[in-house]
A protein has these predicted regions:
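Amphipathic alpha-helical segments within extended alpha-helical solenoids and repeat-rich scaffolds
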Residues: 345-351
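Alpha-helical substrate-recognition element adjacent to the catalytic core
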Residues: 2-150, 241
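Short amphipathic alpha-helical surface patches that mediate protein-protein
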Residues: 52, 325-328, 346
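C-terminal cap/substrate-recognition subdomain and adjoining C-terminal extension
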Residues: 96-119, 123-339, 352-368
């Protein structure tokens, strides 16, 4: 049975999408290290060493490796259910200001005439993120997740997100096709019909796994922000990302009101509000120009425009005769089109030299 996907439609106001990694972007540590690893009697360092070793030895995706390792280590020790993972998520610590950040930034957007939406794009576990205090603040949480049996016990990965696959979700956000199975993400949209252009996206992350998303957003004039732990003040990663042109800005991961990050994101919202007014004027002017010039809006008009261009670029008598035979099949020409055809005949020697040939002469006579 096919599913009918719910899609977000273009708004009457500009929309800014702020996309976040989770671990070490909104939270100071990996989510697995804040309760789960300890509950199975393991050390954080040894867990990741084992998981990464499994990936390396078996040519395995690192995220699939950690998901497999989590299931295996939980066996016989703790229940590995969706509820248990959400309970672990409830214990996850957040950086300063995160709990009030999302509502505050949305309200700032409202004051500026901009809709602000928050999204998670993370290689971490969706179930744990859904257990956090801020889970309901997001339009959509894109993260790795498990398939569960009838008893709610995790059996198999349902979704795995790595650093390269993260980028597909930016296109989903762009077009409003948020469901992971909605093939509408491949549909063509005119630039003016795009729900959230990349220029109106902000990506906030902390490490190499965020680079593909940052690079994509940068290439379309969006905004990429690197964050670092405000307690350790270790800026080595953000310096490297800045040097490699992966980010435009960096700040401490301090989400409190008046912080560097708070001021930066509000400035981006201000800029978006002004820029989208200009883009709106541009699209209005473009539409007026199309209407005034009669730019093709049906198949016959498109065919006429193509043939006129082909005739103008013709570089042989044989090609000219072939194009003329197609032009003769068209019964109606506008005054502007007739003018174009006559100018081409005067300027292109491949036409002017054979104006007395029967087919060419009869075609141009029909334009009088």
């Amino acid at each position: 049975m096919s599913k009918e996907f719910i899609r977000k439609l273009k708004e009457s106001k500009p929309v800014v999408a702020i996309c976040y990694d989770f671990d070490k972007t909104l939270s100071p540590d990996d989510m697995q290290a804040q309760g789960y690893i300890q509950s199975v009697g393991d050390e954080v360092e040894s867990f990741w060493k084992e998981s990464n070793g499994l990936a390396e030895e078996n040519d395995m995706d690192q995220n699939l490796a950690y998901m497999f390792t989590m299931i295996r280590k939980a066996h016989g020790k703790v229940l590995f259910t969706k509820k248990a993972l959400m309970d672990y998520g409830a214990k996850v610590q957040l950086f300063p200001g995160v709990e009030t950040w999302f509502k505050r930034i949305r309200e700032y957007g409202v004051d500026k005439g901009v809709i602000v939406e928050h999204y998670i794009i993370s290689s971490g576990l969706k179930e744990m993120i859904e257990g956090t205090k801020v889970a309901n603040e997001f339009e959509k949480i894109y993260a790795s997740s498990f398939y569960y049996d009838k008893d709610g016990v995790a059996q198999w990965p349902a979704q795995v997100i790595n650093y390269t696959s993260k980028t597909q979700f930016l296109f989903r956000i762009e077009k409003g096709t948020l469901d992971v199975n909605d093939s509408g993400v491949n549909d063509y949209f005119k630039p003016e019909d795009i729900r959230i252009p990349f220029r109106n996206m902000v990506y906030i992350g902390d490490s190499d796994t965020d680079i593909p998303c940052m690079k994509l957003i940068n290439s379309y004039s969006g905004h990429s922000i690197g964050v670092y732990n405000p307690k350790t003040k270790d800026k080595r990663k953000v310096y490297k990302m800045m040097e490699d042109k992966r980010i435009k800005y960096y700040t401490p991961a301090d989400y409190t009101e008046g912080s560097e990050l708070d001021i930066l994101v509000k400035t981006i919202i201000d800029t978006t509000a002004s820029n989208e007014k200009l883009m709106s004027i541009h699209y209005q002017d473009k539409q007026e120009q199309i209407s005034r010039n009669g730019q093709p809006d049906n198949q016959e008009d498109k065919e006429k425009e193509k043939l006129i261009m082909d005739l103008e670029n013709s570089n042989s008598f044989k090609q000219t005769h072939s194009i003329i035979s197609k032009l003769k099949k068209i019964k109606s020409w506008t005054l502007e089109e007739k003018k174009q055809l006559k100018i081409i005949a005067e300027k292109n020697k491949q036409i002017s030299s054979i104006m007395k040939d029967g087919d060419v002469a009869s075609f141009y006579s029909s334009l009088e």
